[in-house]
Every structure is written in structure tokens, then in C-alpha cells.
Amino acid sequence: PYLAASSVEQRNKALLLVAENLRANAAKIFEENKRDLAAAEEDHIAQAVKKRLKFDEGKLRDVIKGIEQLVALPDPLGKVTLKRQLDEGLVLNRVSCPIGVIGVIFEARPDALVQISSLCIKSGNCAILKGGRETTYTNRILFQIIHDSIIDAGLPADCMLQAEQHSEIDELLSCHETVDLLIPRGSNSFVQYIMNHTKIPVMGHADGICHIYVDRDYDPNKAI
């Protein structure tokens, strides 16, 4: 409730502190990321996955830029998105508000942790974050920086939590009385597993479908 009722100035302050502290701790972040990359090499992780889990100067610059852009956006809370007079003296308003507690489960992308955390802070939502084991060290230091920034901004410490153990996924799936929404990011089979093993509403996805339509009068070799 405190986070949902916080001012946009306080939430923006937290975001700016996150950006500032990410810059200040860049060397430590890169060092922890090297540990994840070394472990991935030992475990013979696929090259595509290793590319995603790498967190370098470019990705740090991108996430900080994203945070600054988020700060520049207006407050998403308390906006009247629909107003309708139902009867004399009776007006129905639809007002934007936080969802509540969002559980986000994602795979080997440490930059996703920063992006998700930032979006939750701006929108006044509490978050429970579970990243892939491939990015354990990077996620740990990134979360610590974000968590410390939240506290320094005066927001409650428990508005952002991190789950590290794989066993905690099933525990999270059972929290239908306290978690309002789950967002799994990963393979189709992973998303289907989440959807099939929880009573919590899931914002999931299936396999992407891409189509190309070519007019019969056009040369396919030019169109494709």
C-alpha cells in the first residue's frame, strides 16, 4: 500500500538513484558478470545464451538510458481513463492504479532484471524477481544495487524481493492469495508449465507466428 500511495517524485527519486548507483558500481557488476560467463563456459552453455547473459558497458548504458526515459514519463497512476455518468449524481470513473504484487520469472538476461524492476517502481507495483541460474552473480549484485536505492529513496524494503533457488518457483506459483500477477519470460514450454501449475493470473505467451503475404502479381524473389 505504501508504494502504491507514494508520490511520483519519490518513485522517480528511487529510479535516479538506481541509475546513479549502477554507474558507480559498474566495475563490480562487470566482475560478477565475468563469473557468470566463466561458469557458462564450463557448463558448455549455448553461444546464443552466453550472448544474452553478457552484461557489458553497452548494456549498462542502455539500461541507464531506459531508466532516464522512464523518469521523464508522466505518472501512470491516478489517471482517469474513463468517465461516464450513469445517472443523475452518479458518475463512474476508471482510474489507473497498481496491479499489486507481480512475480516475474525470466531467463538468462540480467538487463531484464533492471528493466522489470524499473517498470515496477515507476508503476507502484511490488515485485518478486526470479532470474535464471546462468546469471546468478550478475543478478545478485544488480538486485542489491536496486534494493539499496529503493531504501535510500524512502520506499519500503519489501517492495522488491529476489528469489534465487529453482525450488522457489513452485513456492511462488502457490502464492495465489498474495501475488496478483505472474509474468514468465522464456520458452513456450516454460510458459506453459507456469500457466498449468498456478491459480495466479498469468500474462504469458505462446510461440510467435510470423507470416509474409505476397501479392500474386509481385515477384517473390524481390519480396522475400
Language-model segments: which ranges?
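Substrate-binding/gating loop at the entrance of the active-site cleft, primarily
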Residues: 83-127, 132-142
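ALDH superfamily catalytic-core signature
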Residues: 108-111, 115-126, 141, 145, ...
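General beta-strand structural signal in soluble alpha/beta enzymes
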Residues: 79, 129-130, 161-164, 183-186, ...
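N-terminal Rossmann-like NAD(P)+-binding subdomain of aldehyde/semialdehyde dehydrogenases
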Residues: 1-91
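Active-site/ligand-binding-proximal alpha/beta "capping" segment
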Residues: 172-181, 187-191, 196, 220
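A structured beta-alpha segment of the ubiquitous adenosine-cofactor-binding alpha/beta core
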Residues: 56, 64, 87, 91-94, ...
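A glycine-rich helix N-cap at a beta->alpha junction
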Residues: 147-162
